[in-house]
């Protein structure tokens, strides 16, 4: 079971933009190999930073509106939102250390 909640076009504003804590958004698709590689890393981050950040996933096939709104061209793309604004992003399957360092800047 994934530690990250699934977010849709209709719940993105409520779950991400209106969040009181920073949010890591994993834009992914079921057919994407690198997305499957980074998924366990995203889950580890969700557990490691529980209570400090919220971690959610957006399936770009099922939710094209949010993906196009944020200019998602390749997946996986991991974006960090804080106070309703995109503050950082990482593209591609990255190691946990890279993702942690990126997140730490926004806590």
Swiss-Prot record:
It holds the Pfam family Thioredoxin. Participates in various redox reactions through the reversible oxidation of its active center dithiol to a disulfide and catalyzes dithiol-disulfide exchange reactions. Keywords: Disulfide bond, Electron transport, Redox-active center, Transport. Transmembrane segments: none annotated. It comes from Nostoc sp. (strain PCC 7120 / SAG 25.82 / UTEX 2576). PANTHER family: GEO12009P1. InterPro entries: Thioredoxin, Thioredoxin-like_sf, Thioredoxin_CS, Thioredoxin_domain. The keyword tRNA-binding does not apply. The lineage of its organism: Bacteria, Bacillati, Cyanobacteriota, Cyanophyceae, Nostocales. PROSITE patterns: THIOREDOXIN_1, THIOREDOXIN_2. The keyword DNA damage does not apply. NCBIfam families: PRK10996.1 (NF008229), thioredoxin (TIGR01068). Gene3D superfamilies: Glutaredoxin. Residues 2-107 form the Thioredoxin domain. Disulfide bonds join 32-35. GO terms for cellular component: cytoplasm. This is Thioredoxin 1. The gene is trxA.
């Amino acid at each position: 079971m994934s530690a990250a909640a699934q977010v849709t076009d209709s719940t993105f504003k409520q779950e991400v933009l209106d969040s009181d804590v920073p949010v890591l958004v994993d834009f992914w698709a079921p057919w994407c190999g690198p997305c499957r590689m980074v998924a366990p890393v995203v889950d580890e981050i969700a557990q490691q930073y529980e209570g400090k950040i919220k971690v959610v996933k957006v399936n770009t096939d099922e939710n094209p509106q949010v993906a196009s709104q944020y200019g998602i061209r390749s997946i996986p793309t991991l974006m960090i939102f804080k106070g309703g604004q995109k503050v950082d992003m990482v593209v591609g399957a990255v190691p946990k250390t890279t993702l942690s360092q990126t997140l730490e800047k926004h806590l």
